[in-house]
Regions:
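N-terminal accessory beta-strand-rich subdomains and adjacent acidic, glycine-rich linkers
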Residues: 3-136
Length: 136
């Protein structure tokens, strides 16, 4: 473990757009999928960090599946573990959220924009929240 790594429990790999959140016992790994959505790659026993966890994305052609791209019959939101699935994106499982927009549409599409890793936990003004005394 390199100096200061015990404090840094979130690692981001820019090239693969992968986040690795971990503690002594567990790892939670998510990535930015090729369509900009967040995909959940792994949650379980602690894994050693590596720059590329893309082998955890299950991509294969399946019959009777809706595909995002005509040229890629292996990428389907219906079969990928998404971090926050929404209604109307070719994933027919229950969405995490379904919004009724002013124009009557219920289709939403949230895409990854950016990230910021900060030390500690910001205070939530006027709201109850957990806190840490060590700044970790």
């Amino acid at each position: 473990m390199e100096k200061g790594e015990h404090m840094r429990r979130i690692i981001f790999h820019e090239k693969t757009k992968t986040f690795h959140l971990y503690n002594e016992k567990i790892s939670y790994i998510l990535c930015v999928l090729e369509n900009g959505h967040l995909g959940q790659l792994y949650f379980g026993k602690r894994l050693h960090d590596k720059a590329d966890f893309s082998y955890l994305v299950e991509k294969r052609e399946r019959p009777m599946t809706s595909y995002i791209y005509e040229w890629d019959r292996t990428f389907s939101l219906e079969h990928i573990r998404q971090e926050y699935p929404v209604y109307g994106t070719t994933d027919y499982r229950h969405p995490a959220i379904e919004l009724l927009q002013e124009n009557g549409s219920r289709i939403s599409e949230f895409r990854y924009d950016s990230y910021e890793i900060i030390d500690g936990k910001p205070k939530l003004a006027g709201l109850p929240a957990t806190y840490t005394e060590s700044g970790e």
